[in-house]
Amino acid sequence: MRRWIGWILLACLLAGGAILCTVRWEAWFGNPAEPEWTDEEISHQFITFDNDSVLRALQRDTLSFLLLGDIHNSLNNKDMKLLSDLHPDVQFWAQLGDWMERPYHYYEQMMYQSLVGTHLDSLPVLAIPGNHEYLKGVVKTLPAHWKTIFPNPQNGPARFLGTTYFVDFPHIRLIAIDTDGLHRVSDYTQVAFWLKKMLHDAGDKFTIVMMHHPIYSTAKGRSNPFMWLAFQSAMREADVVFSGHDHNYARRTKQYKARFWKKEEPTIFIGTNASRKKYEVKDNVNYDCSFSGRPVYEYLQVTPDTLYISTYSLDDMNLIDEFFISR
């Protein structure tokens, strides 16, 4: 009798799993009505730093660029045009993932349309995928068209070519990490060793790490223990670490202890958000500046001896936070 009960329970579990898979098919594997499309069907391909001529043109002593956190379809052509007018001097821009709400053709077209007519439409972009660029599933996957739209440098770890990479300028190294693609322990270790080497090899250059998920979560009820375990040691070599995902703004200074004769410089961790989606900031954390409910963007300037970072409100374009690091 017990054996029959066991078989009945197993059958119920299998049937329930089949029903759940059917109900959750779209959430896990994407909308069946939005199939993958060919390269010929993609209406726009962004300029990236995979192009040597683009990179050579920006080998100058002074650089300026814009950085946007999560967007989630919150910004339109008018917003981008205003950013273009306010900062005509920027030479490229960066985005931390979750530009769109879902990784479908419709949203990809919306993303491009939000840039038409602005100088962000014709400048190089440093892009990384966020969790909303990935198709959900038992194992999340990044649609192939993302790499076609953003043909990034192929200088990262073997399993993350085109999504984890670095870009060098005379006085700064920018490092992009695809955190949503980290599925296995070996992924974390491979990227962590690569990151440590990239930061060490940067020499006297300023170093900025850009990633979608934060090492130190800033939203209430959130934490990323695997991210912290994998990367917190390497990050002591970085000057600034930018992240998104938590839908608020928070800047904190992490002062590491000195090791032997080496004096440790602090690392600045910044969580930023350009979308209307908002989460409350964690309590009991010693932030230098923090708030929720106001979408922002960053304007960065790099000179031979100073890195300037300014944060502006996307509501009224007023300055909210700023700091600089000098060599």
Where does each model-flagged region fall?
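Acidic, histidine-bearing metal-coordination/catalytic regions of metal-dependent phosphoesterases
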Residues: 1-72, 77, 81-91, 117-125, ...
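Extended active-site neighborhood of metal-dependent phosphoesterases/phosphodiesterases
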Residues: 37-50, 57, 105-203, 227-230, ...
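Structural motif
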Residues: 65-67, 94-96, 174-176, 208-210, ...
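Conserved beta-strand->loop/alpha-helix structural units within folded catalytic cores of enzymes
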Residues: 96-99, 199, 210-213, 234
